[in-house]
Amino acid sequence: MRLSDFDFHLPDAAIALRPAEPRDSARLLVVRPGEGLEDRIVRDLPDFLRPGDALVFNDTRVIPARLMGRRAGRETGGGDGSPVAVEATLHRRIAPDRWVAFMRPGKRLKEGDRIAFGHDQDRACQAGMLDATVIAKHEGGEIELAFDFAGVDLDLAVAAHGEMPLPPYIAAKRAEDDRDRADYQTVYAREDGSVAAPTAGLHFTSDLLERLKAGGVSLHFVTLHVGAGTFLPVKTDVVADHKMHAEFGEVPAAVADALNAARAAGGRIVCVGTTSLRLLESATGEDRIIKPFADETAIFITPGYRFRAADVLMTNFHLPKSTLFMLVSAFAGQATMKAAYEHAIAAGYRFYSYGDGSLLFRAATDENGSEQS
């Protein structure tokens, strides 16, 4: 498959800069392969689920992982040794005092460079300044940082000085503000660690969750800490050559058991968001049994993949040539999703992290994962 197979024209105006209010008033495009499309709203979700279905959410919490700072001047002075402004988006924590991050301008950084973050009088940090040392530059553009703080002290410093890491397509149009601290967080978020929101979950309100439970749908929570790699574009023309960045996820034993029991009783597993789906697929064997999981995953789902866990997927509308558009094309079928996105664009659906949602029912596939006609 070529990257161009997943391209489509997306008008700039289609990208949402703010979420719908209230959250569950966002539009919802229901996609049943072979049965056409249906325009609804998110609060109609209970109409499409039945007693015994199991809804799976990602309960990760977004941290303010975007840090602004300056590289200190090197002793050599002048030229590339002069102080320079830098921006870091924390990606993955690897030790109490260490993160790997994506940084701009990363090419101007070297091992041993000192970075001074958080020297902002408007955001004073009681523990002191948030400084770090460049430890290593890794393959894929990641830069390893060792902070002067560790553990809880580092968490507090990042919370004091960091900004919410809005996706690039939104950040290019407006600055992050106080509203984003609430808007870019699900109502059920509880496990700190993500640098991007599991955006399908942003549509849920406490009232909608209660209505789902009242309808006999069980709610389950897993954790996948979304890394900054989710924002990176695919740069290879051959899709199979693309390498995903690893992210840490956990499926508790009790959740795995409950989901297996729900499926055995005839219920469907409904994933809220591609993060929940990717984690469950990583935790599920060829026998379609979901197992407890606590590890990194770099699963890359493209057309031809044979799904083991998910029966239904609720997800937002994704960007052209993105790994997530590849995933939904694998789930509901390439032709189906191209038609669905053409409809969504023509009908004025709002795209991307703060945009509207879609409810996708899995396409029938043969034993090789190929879509059946």
Curated annotation (Swiss-Prot):
Keyword S-adenosyl-L-methionine set for record: yes
Annotated GO MF terms: S-adenosylmethionine:tRNA ribosyltransferase-isomerase activity
The EC number(s) this enzyme carries: 2.4.99.17
InterPro entries: QueA, QueA_dom1, QueA_dom2, QueA_sf
One Gene Ontology term, aspect cellular component: cytoplasm
Catalysed transformations (reactions): 7-aminomethyl-7-carbaguanosine(34) in tRNA + S-adenosyl-L-methionine = epoxyqueuosine(34) in tRNA + adenine + L-methionine + 2 H(+)
Domain of life: Bacteria
Pfam families cross-referenced by the UniProt entry: Queuosine_synth (PF02547)
Keywords of the record: Cytoplasm, Queuosine biosynthesis, S-adenosyl-L-methionine, Transferase
Subunit structure: Monomer.
Name by which UniProt lists this protein: S-adenosylmethionine:tRNA ribosyltransferase-isomerase
Species annotation: Caulobacter sp. (strain K31)
